Amino acid sequence: MMKRLLGLVMLLLFTCTLLTGCNTARGFGEDIKHLGNSISHAAS
């Protein structure tokens, strides 16, 4: 039980850190879009 709770807390902290780094969920989406565009241009 304690390991599961600790795992959920760590996942929540990781997710919050990731979203904070991109400022918002919208910013995260834009970052993924730019990454996709970069990959497309590199493949061309």
From Swiss-Prot:
Chief location: membrane
Keywords for the protein's UniProt record, in alphabetical order: Cell membrane, Lipoprotein, Membrane, Palmitate, Signal
Question: At which residues does the record annotate a lipid attachment of kind S-diacylglycerol cysteine?
Answer: 22
**Where does it reside?**
Cell membrane
Q: Which InterPro entries match?
A: Entericidin
| N-palmitoyl cysteine: lipidated positions | 22
* GO cellular component entries: plasma membrane
Q: How does it sit in the membrane?
A: Lipid-anchor
Q: Where does the UniProt annotation place the signal sequence?
A: 1-21
One GO biological process term is:
response to toxic substance
Presence of keyword Signal? yes
> At the top level of its lineage, which domain of life is listed?
Bacteria
Q: Which family does it belong to?
A: Belongs to the EcnA/EcnB lipoprotein family.
NCBIfam families membership: PRK09810.1 (NF007319)
Q: What does this protein do?
A: Acts as antidote to the effect of entericidin B.
Q: What is the protein name stated in its UniProt record?
A: Entericidin A
As recorded in Swiss-Prot or TrEMBL, the protein's gene is named ecnA
